[in-house]
Amino acid sequence: MLASNSDGASTSVKPSDDAVNTVTPWSILLTNNKPMSGSENTLNNESHEMSQILKKSGLCYDPRMRFHATLSEVDDHPEDPRRVLRVFEAIKKAGYVSNVPSPSDVFLRIPAREATLEELLQVHSQEMYDRVTNTEKMSHEDLANLEKISDSLYYNNESAFCARLACGSAIETCTAVVTGQVKNAFAVVRPPGHHAEPHKPGGFCLFNNVSVTARSMLQRFPDKIKRVLIVDWDIHHGNGTQMAFYDDPNVLYVSLHRYENGRFYPGTNYGCAENCGEGPGLGRTVNIPWSCAGMGDGDYIYAFQRVVMPVAYEFDPDLVIVSCGFDAAAGDHIGQFLLTPAAYAHMTQMLMGLADGKVFISLEGGYNLDSISTSALAVAQSLLGIPPGRLHTTYACPQAVATINHVTKIQSQYWRCMRPKHFDANPKDAHVDRLHDVIRTYQAKKLFEDWKITNMPILRDSVSNVFNNQVLCSSNFFQKDNLLVIVHESPRVLGNGTSETNVLNLNDSLLVDPVSLYVEWAMQQDWGLIDINIPEVVTDGENAPVDILSEVKELCLYVWDNYVELSISKNIFFIGGGKAVHGLVNLASSRNVSDRVKCMVNFLGTEPLVGLKTASEEDLPTWYYRHSLVFVSSSNECWKKAKRAKRRYGRLMQSEHTETSDMMEQHYRAVTQYLLHLLQKARPTSQ
């Protein structure tokens, strides 16, 4: 028979392949164009590509998986049985499947089945299998008691059957991909699986569907499947999947998840970027741990372009499995992320460029029924070859960029595509110095030569020794009526290294130090000056990192109590940048500074707002609001909130810049003119 493409051309198609032509995008590819002259391999490749085009995509769904439910019919649990129904209904409404499998369906329906004991024991222990299976004969009272002592789990007498059905269906669907029955496939299954560890279930998960499937493919098809890539974009870290393959060199596990220093579920540090595998599997775990809520399309696409796809290409898998949770989708009350269906479609499309297109999608989480259905439909359409929609955001936020930079530094030890290889920045030899110490030594020397600015002694055990030589002061600040206290982070060093090493070209490297503008200005005004530099890393006596914010707060209190408060200065001005702002705001909350401090100018960039302690005296927030300028990047999350920021955060000023150093330089003239204006107003009362 003949099928028409979008240009009206006709193409010969076998009768057995008739149903596939109901998908418009495929017919566009079926042209009569002949290959250009070339090798026989070119013809063979095109023949292979044509066979892939003619294959259908697979889909597995069985309504019996909805039998797994809470004991109480009125219990509104997020892992709702309707989740799989809504996904299937969305795909059916789009015209890709029907209730009763039909040859005319766009998707080839894969029959569901239960996983066997032998298959499950490839990942899980016999004890865990028995624990789940025993629930089939438990009374409601025993099931309720088991739920109380379980980790985010519920059971009824059908739960074990549904878990076996979900896992077996995943295996069967993936088998169809590996054997070439379909070109790719989507298993709409529940309960989900990626939190189920080898020895215990947890987090709504009974058996680990993806892990059992991956292990089954490796063992059943050793000639075809030697390397498996598992990409887990569920918003939670897949602790069970990572544990199952942590020492396996043949499985690359990549997880993008909300982490927040281990506070987000599953609530451990197992999903941190530093956990990269062990033994022969070292480097085969790639964790991308997002630091906060609100990540969106641009952040995930950035992660895919910078980490996921480069590592995946280098790994060169024979099969791609996706732990496809939709709880990072916009509207999900648990995830609180902002991914659109287009983002899921784009990520799916990128993965389809691997492993000759052998991609298997297995449903995991996702708890907003509208979000999960629209997102799943977008993934299904990508599997069919339909181009993705447009992204909502096309760039990554600063927090995402910071996370990806951290991940690439760690993974550069294991992947050539992540070069230059990250080096150990902890000096161990006597002839090695940290650059921030070298720069501070240079600054101290230059400031002494230009303005006779010297080191201020820090004589207190509670303040880290790292701050020695980091606090400088003008020689006569005690006797000055006007005093400027600047607390800032180390200056930036901009430079380019070689492509294979971390060696900087010093001739092309620059030191960017906007604080020097304020120092020079204060000295020209004949003011007193205290310059406090905050290193990026603060350590204790044994060179172990400590909480930098606590140390900054302690240092600011020390300088105030032992130096500033004892001076004769009547007009004191604070300038803070980055993490240093925490120290100044804490000082204003902890000491009576309002009589002498005329203004606090803080530069925060994209960092979260820093407010006075909530227990502060009643009129202090009002004083702070009236005596502060807080420059915040226009891309800061605070501007997206409907409510106006409270006064305890100070008087907020928008800046077009994101880096605090850029902001300090850009607003230098406005700030210094404002300080002079305040000084002029203060003079009649101070004389």
Curated annotation (Swiss-Prot):
Catalysed reactions, semicolon-separated: N(6)-acetyl-L-lysyl-[histone] + H2O = L-lysyl-[histone] + acetate
Residue intervals passing through the bilayer: none
Record's protein name: Histone deacetylase clr3
Keyword Hydrolase applies: yes
Uppermost EC category: hydrolase
Subcellular location: Nucleus; Chromosome, Centromere; Chromosome, Telomere
One GO CC term, this protein: subtelomeric heterochromatin
Residues at the active site: 195
Gene name of the record: clr3
Keywords assigned: Centromere, Chromatin regulator, Chromosome, Hydrolase, Nucleus, Repressor, Telomere, Transcription, Transcription regulation
InterPro entries per record: Arb2-like_domain, HDAC_PDAC, His_deacetylse, His_deacetylse_dom, His_deacetylse_dom_sf, Hist_deAcase_II_yeast, Ureohydrolase_dom_sf
Entry annotated with the keyword Repressor: yes
EC number(s) from the headed UniProt entry: 3.5.1.98
Highest taxon of the lineage: Eukaryota
Lineage of source species: Eukaryota, Fungi, Dikarya, Ascomycota, Taphrinomycotina
PANTHER family to which the protein is assigned, alphabetical: HISTONE DEACETYLASE, HISTONE DEACETYLASE HDAC1-RELATED
GO terms for MF: histone deacetylase activity; histone H3K14 deacetylase activity, hydrolytic mechanism
Family per similarity comment: Belongs to the histone deacetylase family. HD type 2 subfamily.
